[in-house]
Amino acid sequence: VVNFSAFETFYSDRRPFFAENNNLFDVSDYMHRIINTRRIGGRPDYDCSIYGELEEYCRQNKSETSEIDFALKYTQKGEIDFGFMSASERDEKFSKGRDFYALRLNTKSDNLQYGYLGTYVDKPLTDESAQVNSIDFLYLPSEIHRMDGNFMHSKVKDKDGFGLTAGYGYTPSKNFYSGIGIKYYDERLDLNDMGYLILNDRFMFNGRTQFKRTSFQ
């Protein structure tokens, strides 16, 4: 599949280590994901201009993937669910591997679930780092009402970015659903070093009502 649009297409990770037992780290909706594990082992960072006479050779020998030296994931369920993820890429001839870290905390209290997810990426080739912090919640006051939200902050190249999503859903029966939501991503919000954001500098308001009728012979 070739994507000719101006927006990056999200593809889920099929590598077993990253795909399995990963629900604790899943803070996302269709516009963004705080963690996109396909970034780990992805296209390396390059700056071929620093290699002088080898600059053209560097440009012609860029790799599309990075080798992974190691990856670690630990989760623990309890009153406070805890998760930690770390991975380090291997250095190659014209690039230096990045280091990825993620920390997840999540807890429940009656009908309220809330948590924190933070990521940090160290990029030694460019001597830069990327940090994202997010707070998410899910509130279920009754069987038919649902409220959720995600507040995000990024710090990339010393620039702070902010975003939030919030939604309300009403499901009085299995055949009817109605909901509204808002999304705000400012022009400096950048999740893409370890996450996914289809586009920033957007404010969106959306609503949906659905009626479903099913009959069986």
Residue locations for each model-derived region?
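Outer-membrane beta-barrel channel domains
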Residues: V1-Q217
